[in-house]
Structure formats: structure tokens, C-alpha cells
């Protein structure tokens, strides 16, 4: 999607070029696009490996990371909380959340095999830098908005402080509902891109 968006945006720039320079401009844009995909993939896989606590140079790290993402999608698990559980080595909790136990067990075996002979202190530090504990969720924002509409800005202030340091546990500021999605029996707040 990012590649297509960039291609579309760059093609909209072509009419801005002088007539005699349009071919050169098109060639320059094509060269930029050729560099985009490998650069994007490199940054994406590096980021994924950091989130997973895996060494980027290991031949199986990217596939292991993609396997975990497939599990999150298939099992409809919370992305943020699943990465925090992986970071905290809460493998049993993650496993218990899965219907396809064999898929999770295969992932975990591969994951542990990759990490087995690595400097896990460094990899764990990478995970902590890449996985926020707190993210602004719709229900959190809605709660703050509703309070602010009543001229009570305490929730806005609390969220501002909490989200200012999303990678650090803040038990004095957090509420249980800050740590994950609402339970399925509580209606979620739907928002649009223009909200």
C-alpha cells in the first residue's frame, strides 16, 4: 500500500515538471521507487525483530516474526498486549489465548531456538524499547472526552502523563482498562479517520 501511495503521489508531481524535463523526471521518480521497496522491507524486518526480541541477522528471525503476526491475526489477539506478553515471557498466557495450540507451539519452539545462543539481555532491551505498554485506545479517549465535556480535565491530564512514557510501567497512573482492549461484552467506541 505504501509503495502504491508513493507511486501515485510521485506521478502527480510529473505535470509540475517542465515539458522538456518530464522524461528525466519520470526516470528519477522510477529510480526512487526502485529504492523504496528494499529499504522499506529492511526497516520493517528490523523493527519486527526488535519487537520480537530476535536478532535481525538470524536467517529465521523474519519468518518467526511473521509467524507470530499470523497467530495474532488468526486468533484475533490484541497486538500490543501480545507483544508485551512475549516480552514478559508469559508464554502460557499467550498459548492459553490460542485455539490452534499446535501453531503456537511450533512458533514458540522456533522462537526459543533462535534466541537460545544469543545475547538475550540485549534482545530483551530491544523489545522493551520497541513495545509500548500503553497506547491510546478508543475507549480511553472517549472516557477523557466525556469527562472534558463536563469540564473535568483530570482524565485528559492522566492520559497525557501516562502516554508521555508509554514504555515504562506506571502503576500509580494506570487503570486496568488501560492495559488492553475492553472485554467483549462492553461495546467499543467506533471512530473514523476523520474523528
Residue ranges of model-derived segments:
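Regulatory N- and C-terminal appendages and interdomain linkers associated
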Residues: 1-195
Amino acid at each position: 500500500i505504501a509503495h502504491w501511495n508513493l507511486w501515485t503521489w510521485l506521478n502527480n508531481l510529473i505535470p509540475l515538471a517542465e515539458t522538456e524535463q518530464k522524461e528525466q523526471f519520470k526516470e528519477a521518480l522510477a529510480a526512487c521507487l526502485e529504492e523504496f521497496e528494499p529499504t522499506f522491507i529492511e526497516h520493517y524486518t528490523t523493527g519486527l525483530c526488535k519487537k520480537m526480541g530476535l536478532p535481525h541477522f538470524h536467517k529465521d528471525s523474519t519468518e518467526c516474526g511473521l509467524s507470530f503476526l499470523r497467530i495474532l491475526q488468526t486468533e484475533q489477539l490484541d497486538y500490543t498486549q501480545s507483544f508485551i506478553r512475549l516480552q514478559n515471557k508469559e508464554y502460557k498466557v499467550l498459548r492459553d489465548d490460542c485455539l490452534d495450540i499446535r501453531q503456537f507451539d511450533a512458533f514458540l519452539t522456533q522462537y526459543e531456538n533462535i534466541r537460545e545462543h544469543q545475547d538475550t539481555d540485549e534482545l530483551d532491551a530491544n523489545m522493551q524499547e520497541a513495545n509500548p505498554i500503553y497506547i491510546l485506545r478508543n475507549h480511553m479517549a472517549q472516557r477523557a472526552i466525556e469527562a472534558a465535556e463536563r469540564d473535568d480535565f483530570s482524565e485528559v491530564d492522566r492520559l497525557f502523563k501516562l502516554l508521555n512514557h508509554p514504555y515504562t510501567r506506571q502503576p500509580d497512573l494506570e487503570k486496568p482498562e488501560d492495559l488492553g482492549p475492553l472485554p467483549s461484552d462492553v461495546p467499543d467506541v467506533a471512530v473514523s479517520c476523520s474523528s
